[in-house]
């Protein structure tokens, strides 16, 4: 007997029967609902059940199951959950488990809400005693791993393996968990999980698991452990495939081990494995990220040649590398190639290009790319808009970025980018507005946003709000990181709130965060507050924790201690550090030596050096330290430091360092020490160069050892060194000073014959030497024959010739030389003019002297020199103006006296260009004073006068005269 026809109209007639009060049997209802289920009339099932429920007709567990499945098949998971929770006890074990599997799967997969699936799973285990299948547990784990929610993934895994459920998990689950930890940047947890799984005996790893394990080890930088693992697996008979090698190579790239990655790729190819599109893409991506885009492009060509078709990931990797290097046009060429071969582009590729465009500052082109995206049917997501917003902010167009953000539904990155940009320009009003919008959007705060908000509060001086936000971080499931503590400490230190900064620093010390930047910042702040003892304690703690001391912080502390306690303060610090591991404070101790040397505290510097030697530390002598000692006429101390230093110290010294000391020793007259240091350097394997020997030759000449200097010069070629222009210049100059002009000219000719080009200084040495002795004909011969065609005479050459003729009293020739070279645009210098003016004045030819004086005062080089003296004196009246006035008044002798004063001011010792003394002549020129000062720079006149007085028995007058002259010498 049939209770219902097999037509849709029959269905409605049965429903009509129910409405009329007819009560079918449970068996009939069951058969009817199963019939509807086979027809997938799920809505009809639910409508029919609603009528049954309204009639309060009792139904059995099979009917409850059919209704539950109807809800599930209609994806009405919330209704299904509610229905199942009410009636689950009426279902048999198998259908109940199957329904829960489907319900959890529906939320986790279809709705992409694995967290809801986890809630149902917890409820199942806690309240219903129902265990979903192992497949459900595994699918939940996979979903959480994909989302990076590893805490939830591990919770599901623990439920799966507890004693009540006791489902085994396989290598695919294990590899998924390991991969998940690596993706979130916690490879150490991946390694720990693997070791626990193996140690517990629940897992026998296969190649799949080992493949993901290699990634974790590479990320941790444990390259040697990877090699050991591979060797062990080879011994156990594992055969590696392309996937294993690709993962291994990818791990090396992520760990920054480029060379190791390329070596493994070569090994893979040598073992006969052909690269596929994945392995090629990994190589290309790794090379592009390292900046080797040209090599990546070469690989792209190779893979195409081998018949391996690049995919979108391959092309995107290269385009990202090109954009990173600023090669936008090349990136767009590749982009157009992608389009031409018919590969469908995605949003990420556009984001990559837009980011590259923004970095170049071409924002108009970036907006054009947005339009191009939409034309291709790619709807820009917040990822794209965040890229544009970031580009606008980088270009300083923060207001425009703000406007763009108002047209999209922003995320935490949107608001953190805007907030950080407004903080940088210190726009407080905009900061407050962005914060308001962020709070209104009710977006969960991440750690980056929290740190930016802290920075904003501190910028505004809202220290209470900053502290409140910091205290609220645990409630938001946020853990302070290095940036958090650094931001808070910096904010407090900036306004001098050292107590609050120290309190925050103590919070850092209690945490697991180990931030060198915070230690450095607090040390710097303590130094500024003068709390040097506390700063030293923090320094010691920093080193004990193995943290890095910033060089700026180190030097700030040293300078502060020296400013407060002088040399004793530095020595106190150094002795206080003796308890520490020697190597950690090496840099600071070397800096202490440098500081003490710069301050002229050489004894203290040597004491620090001796402490370092006792501790077996490597003392570095950078050129700055050695040069400081030499510049302070402490070459002998530098010499002693070097010869008494250990092997490790000397290994850092090169020929430049030795030459600096040798040059200083020669200048200070320690020739024997200089020669000893040469031998010492050679014994340490340092090859001395021509510059070193130039210092020695010059030192010998200065000590009157010209013969020895020439012998050393002759020996240079024997030791494989070629004398330079400087070498010849030193010897020629000193030969001329000794009056050995023929030897000087022979050396000059020898120099030219060897292909060296004498400079003007060398020629001037010979010319000036001849002129000093009045041998003007020889001087002119050198100028006309030897110089011409090789080098152009300069102002010094002209002035030397003028001086020579003036000494002979031949003013006509002196004037002729002046005029001849003037016509060639070579003017005399200050002294050339002075010699001429004095010469004509002595001859009584005052008008000619006056004309030359007038010409002198418009000479560019002379005016510059006089102005330099003016600047040094800072007098209200211009010296040049005063001289012009004297010239116009015809007072040439008085002008000469002032010019002599200028000469003695510029060259007070006759040769030192760097010392100056104050002029006292602008008003009443004291004739007697000038006369006495003339003696200062004329030793022969001084000696002659003193000798004459002594010979005639006028010792008292001689003594008074000497004291008078000494009083005029520069102090």
Swiss-Prot record:
Residues 1-64 form a transit peptide. It comes from Arabidopsis thaliana. It is found in: Mitochondrion. GO terms for cellular component: mitochondrion. Belongs to the PPR family. P subfamily. Gene3D superfamilies: Tetratricopeptide repeat domain (1.25.40.10). This is Pentatricopeptide repeat-containing protein At5g57250, mitochondrial. InterPro entries: Mito_RNA_Proc_CCM1, Pentatricopeptide_rpt, TPR-like_helical_dom_sf. PPR repeats lie at residues 101-136, 137-173, 174-208, 211-245, 247-281, 282-316, 317-351, 352-386, 387-421, 422-445, 452-486, 487-521, 522-556, 557-590, 591-625, 626-660, 695-729, 730-764, 765-799, 800-834, 835-869, 870-904. It comes from the Eukaryota. Pfam families: PPR, PPR_1, PPR_2, PPR_3. Keywords: Mitochondrion, Repeat, Transit peptide.
């Amino acid at each position: 007997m049939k209770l219902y026809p097999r037509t849709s109209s029959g269905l409605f007639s049965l429903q009509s029967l129910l409405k009329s009060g007819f009560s079918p049997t449970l068996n009939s209802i069951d058969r009817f609902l199963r019939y509807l289920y086979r027809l997938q009339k799920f809505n009809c099932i639910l409508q029919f059940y609603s009528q049954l429920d309204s009639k309060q007709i009792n139904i059995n567990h099979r009917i409850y199951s059919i209704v539950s499945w109807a809800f599930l098949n209609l994806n009405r998971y919330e209704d299904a959950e509610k229905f199942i929770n009410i009636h689950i006890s009426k279902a048999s074990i198998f259908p109940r488990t199957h329904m829960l599997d489907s319900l959890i799967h529906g939320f986790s997969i279809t709705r992409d809400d694995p967290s809801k699936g986890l809630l149902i799973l917890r409820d199942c285990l806690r309240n219903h005693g129902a265990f979903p299948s192992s497949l459900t547990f595994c699918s939940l784990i996979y979903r959480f791993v994909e989302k990076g929610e590893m805490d939830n993934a591990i919770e599901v895994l623990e439920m799966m393996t507890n004693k009540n459920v006791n489902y085994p998990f396989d290598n695919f689950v294990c590899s998924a968990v390991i991969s998940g930890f690596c993706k979130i940047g916690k490879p150490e947890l991946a390694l720990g999980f693997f070791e626990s799984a193996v140690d517990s005996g629940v897992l026998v790893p296969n190649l799949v698991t080992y493949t993901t394990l290699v990634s974790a080890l590479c990320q941790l930088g444990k390259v040697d452990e990877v090699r050991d693992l591979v060797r062990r697996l080879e011994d156990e008979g594992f055969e590696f495939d392309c996937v294993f090698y690709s993962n291994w190579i990818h791990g090396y790239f992520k760990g920054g081990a480029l060379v190791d990655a390329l070596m493994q790729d070569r090994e893979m190819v040598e073992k006969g494995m052909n690269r596929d599109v994945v392995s090629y893409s990994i190589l290309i991506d790794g090379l592009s990220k390292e900046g080797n885009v040209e090599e990546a492009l070469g690989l792209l060509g190779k893979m195409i040649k081998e018949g391996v078709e690049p995919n979108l990931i391959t092309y995107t990797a290269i385009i990202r590398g090109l954009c990173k290097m600023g090669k936008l046009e090349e990136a767009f060429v590749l982009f157009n190639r992608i389009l031409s071969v018919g590969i469908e582009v995605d949003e990420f590729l556009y984001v990559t290009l837009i980011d590259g465009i923004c970095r170049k500052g071409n924002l108009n082109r970036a907006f054009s790319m947005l339009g191009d995206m939409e034309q291709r049917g790619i709807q820009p997501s917040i990822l794209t808009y965040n890229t544009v917003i970031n580009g606008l902010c980088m270009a300083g167009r923060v207001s425009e970025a703000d406007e763009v953000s108002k047209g999209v539904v922003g995320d935490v990155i949107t608001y953190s980018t805007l907030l950080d940009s407004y903080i940088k320009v210190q726009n407080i009003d905009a900061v407050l507005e962005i914060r308001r919008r962020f709070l209104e959007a009710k977006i969960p705060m991440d750690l980056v946003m929290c740190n930016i908000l802290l920075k904003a509060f501190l910028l505004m001086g809202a220290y209470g709000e900053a502290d409140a936000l910091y205290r609220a971080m645990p409630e938001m499931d946020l853990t302070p990181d290095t940036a958090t503590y650094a931001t808070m400490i910096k904010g407090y230190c900036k306004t001098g709130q050292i107590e609050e900064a120290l309190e925050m620093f103590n919070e850092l010390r209690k945490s697991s965060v180990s931030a060198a930047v915070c230690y450095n910042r607090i040390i710097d702040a303590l130094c500024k507050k003068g709390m040097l003892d506390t700063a030293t304690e923090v320094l010691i703690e920093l080193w004990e924790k193995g943290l890095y001391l910033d060089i700026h912080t180190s030097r700030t502390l040293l300078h502060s201690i020296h400013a407060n306690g002088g040399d004793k303060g530095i020595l106190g610090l150094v002795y206080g550090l003796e308890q520490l591991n020697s190597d950690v404070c090496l840099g600071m101790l070397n800096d202490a030596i440098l500081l003490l040397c710069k301050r002229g505290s050489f004894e203290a510097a040597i004491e620090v050096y001796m402490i370092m030697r006792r501790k077996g530390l490597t003392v570095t002598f950078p050129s700055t330290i050695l040069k400081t000692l030499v510049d302070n006429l402490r070459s002998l101390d530098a010499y002693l430091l070097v010869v008494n230093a250990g092997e490790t110290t000397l290994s850092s010294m090169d020929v430049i360092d030795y030459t600096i000391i040798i040059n200083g020793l020669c200048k200070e007259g320690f020739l024997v020490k200089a020669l000893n240091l040469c031998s010492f350097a050679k014994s340490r394997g340092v090859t001395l160069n021509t510059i070193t020997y130039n210092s020695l030759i010059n030192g010998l000449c200065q000590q009157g050892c010209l013969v020895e200097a020439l012998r050393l010069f002759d020996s240079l070629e024997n030791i494989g060194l070629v004398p330079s222009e400087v070498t010849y210049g030193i010897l020629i100059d000193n030969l001329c000073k000794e009056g050995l002009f023929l030897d000087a000219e022979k050396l000059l000719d020898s120099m030219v014959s060897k292909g060296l080009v004498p400079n003007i200084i060398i020629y001037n040495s010979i010319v000036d030497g001849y002129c000093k002795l009045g041998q003007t004909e020889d001087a002119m011969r050198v100028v006309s024959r030897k110089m011409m065609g090789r080098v152009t005479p300069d102002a010094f050459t002209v002035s030397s010739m003028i001086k020579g003729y003036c000494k002979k009293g031949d003013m006509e020739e002196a004037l002729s030389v002046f005029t001849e070279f003037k016509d060639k645009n070579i003017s005399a210098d200050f002294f050339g003019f002075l010699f001429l003016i004095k010469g004509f004045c002595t001859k009584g030819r005052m008008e000619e002297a006056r004309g030359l004086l007038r010409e002198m005062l418009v000479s560019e080089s002379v005016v510059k020199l006089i102005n330099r003296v003016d600047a040094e004196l800072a007098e209200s009246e211009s010296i040049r103006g005063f001289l012009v006035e004297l010239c116009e008044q015809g007072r040439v002798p008085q002008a000469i006296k002032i010019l002599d004063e200028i000469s003695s001011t510029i060259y007070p010792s006759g040769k030192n260009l760097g010392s100056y003394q104050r002029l006292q002549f602008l008003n009443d020129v004291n004739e007697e004073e000038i006369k006495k000062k003339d003696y200062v720079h004329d030793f022969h006149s001084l000696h002659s006068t003193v000798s004459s007085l002594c010979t005639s028995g006028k010792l008292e007058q001689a003594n008074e005269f000497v004291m008078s002259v000494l009083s005029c010498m520069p102090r």
